[in-house]
Amino acid sequence: MSLGPLKAINDKQLNTRSKLVHTPIKGNTADLVGKENHFKQTKRLDPNNDHHHQPAQKKKREKLSALCKTPPSLIKTRGKDYHRGHFLGEGGFARCFQIKDDSGEIFAAKTVAKASIKSEKTRKKLLSEIQIHKSMSHPNIVQFIDCFEDDSNVYILLEICPNGSLMELLKRRKVLTEPEVRFFTTQICGAIKYMHSRRVIHRDLKLGNIFFDSNYNLKIGDFGLAAVLANESERKYTICGTPNYIAPEVLMGKHSGHSFEVDIWSLGVMLYALLIGKPPFQARDVNTIYERIKCRDFSFPRDKPISDEGKILIRDILSLDPIERPSLTEIMDYVWFRGTFPPSIPSTVMSEAPNFEDIPEEQSLVNFKDCMEKSLLLESMSSDKIQRQKRDYISSIKSSIDKLEEYHQNRPFLPHSLSPGGTKQKYKEVVDIEAQRRLNDLAREARIRRAQQAVLRKELIATSTNVIKSEISLRILASECHLTLNGIVEAEAQYKMGGLPKSRLPKIKHPMIVTKWVDYSNKHGFSYQLSTEDIGVLFNNGTTVLRLADAEEFWYISYDDREGWVASHYLLSEKPRELSRHLEVVDFFAKYMKANLSRVSTFGREEYHKDDVFLRRYTRYKPFVMFELSDGTFQFNFKDHHKMAISDGGKLVTYISPSHESTTYPLVEVLKYGEIPGYPESNFREKLTLIKEGLKQKSTIVTVD
């Protein structure tokens, strides 16, 4: 049974009576204390004043948890007594003890000293944490049991997690294998998906706040920084979190705020840390960490290889723009999850890496589905997919009636106090793995490839494109895509056979590319500037005006049922009256791009550029924008500001760096080298995989009766 979203926290006193143990908070609730030394959840932080990294003060401030006295051996409440057991750990404002009821059941008691209560504000914070945690009911979230108080302390009773945290696991093992991280990530995604469905943002997801139960399933705990949104569009503005895990929009969003995406970012940080051994933005001081986060300055060390599929997932999650991060549903569709997937985590995981090599592909898929079911992911994902199918259907209808296609754009915080695996030690949040296995036969390799391509196709959902009215035009475009895709596949085959002799390498010719563009399709159309300085506008009605840079002339291009496109050439001085408005729009965009946009390349017109070129089609995907030019060149502008163009029927690849450096190579030579020479940060192979899938999709002609 699904629960509705939580209501926003208000000032009314909370009823903390649990259904399991009827022991309400007694006395004046104004005496309750909040996490005051957890200053990050309330103060608008200057990054220079993080309490993890503050310079030495004249007088060291005592942690508020130190005010918490050891509870009596027998803790009496109304209707039920508890026997105090071992000390489990402490955080910034609370201490945690093991306690046992009369039946012998053991719990973790998060204990907050009343002496640390200084204001109504801190009381409300503690009540907020209690209310939010009490409302959570998910197999991968630490269960809230009860809340009560005595004369000295407030006690929050929680499900006990006897096997430590992910932080402890990483400290012991140094680095984890991809199969176990797939398992952990799936469970974490299930818990986050549930929280977000209740409009709850955790805001402090980190390895130290995720615990192991008795069966080594994960449980998210510590809701001290959690917030409830009144509605889906509400934003939060408090700078809070743990330095290594904090999202860039939290650091930079004083005016724009942050929302659910901060938890997605933290997931990406944890994923990287588990596979590499430390957080991606780790540095000696907090200011450097913050600067690296704001610049998305991280890389994958060569001495700790992870799969390309894992890198793609991490890079996408750690997108600077929150809107560009994949949703939890989209994350579960990534190819990476189709790798080896265990049925469970063995009890020896804390001391040694599990061996899952014998799990067959088919069983891995079964295990993955089973894990999603247990984490309550499948039900919510299925409804998301229904909505996605509706959007795709509506989009196909739009294209059939010749409209523009628009698709759905598309501080130490209690690191161990919920787990008896913790100690008094304050954890520091710093934190070929899976050798490539040979497949037994070609059939199995083909099955895996098909499964990966199916998932990749889901990533490449167009968010906008120009409408192609002519069926012959669609066939020409599909043929060009097919030709270029075959050229790439042929180059890959040549590379596997040892490459080509220099005499057979294709001659280097820099293609004409799009150097500037403006998408104004909500009114006029799509404007662009080519490396030849020619300016074009692809209007919403499908026609194009291309104004030449080296002559007072222009082309007017429209669809043709026999040729695909037909182009008419005019002198500017002899322009037809009906095209005057078109040229005014071209001039407007030319001035706009000159004033506001910089060229992405130094390429210009070469002597081998005999014909004028225009843009036939553009398509905006989440990973990149794809341009299809009339000379058969395909250009891909990726969201990380790297650009690639495939020309000469797939034989040549052009790379443009974020700093506008441009170079062209035979594709087979780049494949042989393994990356764009001199540009290891280009992530060439990952981008080529996306390019091939984009071309493959466009090779299929979709017609509507």
Curated annotation (Swiss-Prot):
Its main location: cytoplasm. Residues 82-337 form the Protein kinase domain. One of its GO terms (molecular function) is protein serine kinase activity. Zn(2+) binds at E553, H569, H609, D612. It is found in: Cytoplasm, Cytoskeleton, Microtubule organizing center, Spindle pole body. It comes from the Eukaryota. CDD domains: POLO_box_1, POLO_box_2, STKc_PLK. Its EC number is 2.7.11.21. One of its GO terms (cellular component) is cytoplasm. It is an enzyme of class 2 (transferase). Residues 41-63 are annotated as: Disordered. Residues 513-595, 614-700 form the POLO box domain. ATP binds at L88, G89, E90, G91, G92, F93, A94, R95, C96, K110. It catalyses: L-seryl-[protein] + ATP = O-phospho-L-seryl-[protein] + ADP + H(+); L-threonyl-[protein] + ATP = O-phospho-L-threonyl-[protein] + ADP + H(+). The modification Phosphothreonine is found at T23. The active site is at D204 (proton acceptor). Transmembrane segments: none annotated. GO terms for biological process: cell division; exit from mitosis; G2/M transition of mitotic cell cycle; meiotic spindle assembly; mitotic spindle organization; negative regulation of protein localization to nucleolus; positive regulation of mitotic spindle pole body separation; positive regulation of protein localization to cell division site involved in mitotic actomyosin contractile ring assembly. Interacts with CDC48; the interaction is likely to result in CDC5 degradation. Interacts with CSA1. Present with 1480 molecules/cell in log phase SD medium. Protein kinase required for the cell cycle where it is involved in mitotic exit. A component of the fear (CDC14 early anaphase release) network which promotes CDC14 release from the nucleolus during early anaphase. Phosphorylates SCC1/MCD1 and NET1. Belongs to the protein kinase superfamily. Ser/Thr protein kinase family. CDC5/Polo subfamily. This is Cell cycle serine/threonine-protein kinase CDC5/MSD2.
